[in-house]
Amino acid sequence: RGNSIYTIVDGPSWTEAEANSNKLGGNLVTINDKEEYSWGSDNVWSSQNYVANGFNEETMSYLGFNDKDIEGNYQWSSGEETEWNNLTDLIVAQNWFSQKQHFDGWDYGMIFANRDFEIEGTDARYTPYQNRGNIVLMDDNGSFYRNSGSNIVGIAETKFIRRGDSAYVIVEGPTWEEAEANANKLGGHLVTINDAE
């Protein structure tokens, strides 16, 4: 989408999923606006995408959303500014309305498969509410969900430069083999220079 490649990365914890995203030259996904939120629910954190990539359809994903540095100061791990007026509006209704007492230990954002931004709230326990996201706050390991048997991965978003029909990304790799493996995870290879241009 645009100049980003979205890739599922290993996510034993939010911190490790972010590190795995960094190896691919990116960060855990940043949701910039309602349009990207809807697109992501249909294409990135969708059951169909998970199944196509060998995961079960109820897989959850870590996002770049967090307040790990300063409690209550939500940001994206990419450091990007987004079109949201208030990032707390992205927190799922149950967390926001009933579980704020846990927020000191819940610093990392996750999302269930297929979840989109809600223009009109759908959780009957908290309706009426409007314009709320579905980002679940949890500890670094997603302990509650992981201990309940949920599969959790990360969604990496890597910016690229397009030239012709190629996309160029800087990936991490202390060795050629590791750099090539990271390029493969994005569906490509290390660069081939075809001519002087």
What residue ranges belong to the model's regions?
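Extracellular, disulfide-bonded carbohydrate-recognition/adhesion ectodomains
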Residues: 1-197
